Amino acid sequence: MIDRSLTRRTLARQAAYAAASMTLLGASPVLAQAPGKAGTKVLRYVFPVAETGFDPARIVDLYSRIVTAHIFESLYTYDHLARPVKIRPALAQGMPEHSEDYRTWTVKVRPGILFQDDPAFGGQPREVTAQDFVYALKRFADPANKSPVVAGVLEQKYIGLAALREKALKEKKPFDYDTEIEGIRALDRHTIQFRLEEPRPRFGDSLAAHDLFGAVAREVVEKYGDAIPAHPVGTGPFRLVQWRRSSLIVLERNPTYRDVRYEAEPASDDAQGQALLARFKGRRLPMIDRVEISIIEETQPRWLAFLNAQIDFVNVPGEFVNQAMPNGRVAPNLAKAGIQGYRALNPDSAFTYFNMDDPVVGGYTPEKVALRRAIGLAMDVEREIRVIRRGQAVPAQSMVVPHTSGYDPAFKSENGDYDPARAQALLDLHGYVDRNGDGWRERPDGKPLVLEVATQPDQTSRQFDELWKTNMARVGIRVSFSIGKWPEQLKAARAGKLMLWTLGSSAAGSDGQSSLARLYGPQAGSQNLARFKHPEFDRIYQRMNVIPDGPERDELFRQAKLIVTAFMPYKVTVHRFNNDLVHPWLVGYRRPLFWQEWWHMVDIDNTRRPAK
């Protein structure tokens, strides 16, 4: 349970933790709380951004997907300890079989897997069947669900799925779930077959995503209707028992979860992985009973919650990294308290997108391209890393992220340059000049040039806002800010209502092409927030889909990066380090590389938790 306040005695007991921070400021953060049973193993956790809901077909944000990844299960998953990553069966019985041309994929579903109990099942156990996966995939194509990832699903080219969606749109009738399509079929109760219009050599990897592509029971969706985001019913290790929007999320052990044991295949030279396997091998999962998640958007209260042992785990906010993990090592005062730290370069990127449909920064004409390039050249990424991120990032050269195919650490591009003089020359050359002597540039047609930057009301965002003003003032560009909560900004971004916005993205798999989906024309309004449309880029992207990994595909990655650098629909700034701290009573933690689920793989030792 997370307390709303701390007694004087508790504050004194936690002074050892607080000593490594700046000060406690005499108060602890106000957190949500939920009733729990004594002796229950509870993982207490914090999200820095509010969730949006728990219907896999309707979400795209990271934090909602972290929750759904622990409730639903897909056909495949990732080995928790294997590095390089390895896919293994989850609800599938064995690995997928595929045709020689990679167009037909067949999967056996394990018999006897049960959904968690729910009133929708009329008090009877409900076994997962192949049809549940057929239904779940079709839901992404249903226009009524307004799925933010529908373009990505259709990109797999399931035969007949796009036509079924178009039929519903054209006739303005409910989506026809009962019509069988060739692309996604249940051959029998426990066999599902996927048939694709084009080869997809890496299709099997797409089936390893608990957060989005788990089994969904049709009767549950039909029972709850529009309230389905609050009623996730899956087969995973946990079930949702309480949800106060943007405040508290509580999961508990799923009592119908099957007998799953801790198994993994760490590399022989992976000392940490081998130690975890030796400690937990054969333990029944999940090892904990309950997960309590509070939402704390401000970094200082989030950090204090960890120091005061109100939460068990924290991704250290940037402004506290140097106190918590100087030189990448846990600070002595924290280490003395048994706190452990983990640092790793994430398979992610932070970037600013430009709305290509916006009349100020969008467009493909030379002056609009020059404006975006100039803005990118004026962005002092090294200062961002040094001052705001406290050194916890590396400069990015392209959208493709570390640890994925297509990432080349030797690749360099203008995307990684900081050159205000070149930025000013570009602006001067293309007519963005100060016509009235007020110190600010106007557009070539004489209208004011003002960048409207979408941002959030938290402390870290305010630091980025100040850097925006400083960077742009240096080249004579005025900036204003549109402030809103992160979920609101995401909704506006997908609708094409923002001029530009800075956010981040993490890879969900080892194929670097997923990062390039943010530039693929048909993904506009979905992953492609910039609404970038470029025929040659789309051709390259489509070719990458159908060929195996190898030299040809590597060359296509290079060409795609050059196109993005030339047109600058995104300014990719950094790849970030994660710095995680865990209290000594949270045991078995290891940050996943691409996947979201890990709560079932850790244990809580209540004997080491401080008494209240």
Which residue ranges define each predicted feature?
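Aromatic-residue-lined binding/catalytic grooves and analogous aromatic/hydrophobic interfacial grooves
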Residues: 213-217
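N-terminal secretory signal peptides
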Residues: 1-25, 31, 294
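Short N-terminal segments immediately surrounding and downstream of signal-peptide cleavage
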Residues: 35-48
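Surface-exposed intrinsically disordered loops and tails
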Residues: 160-173
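N-terminal lobe/hinge region of extracytoplasmic solute-binding protein
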Residues: 46-100, 233
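Active-site-proximal polar cores
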Residues: 573
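Extracytoplasmic/periplasmic ligand-capture domains
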Residues: 3-7, 33-37, 80-81, 96, ...
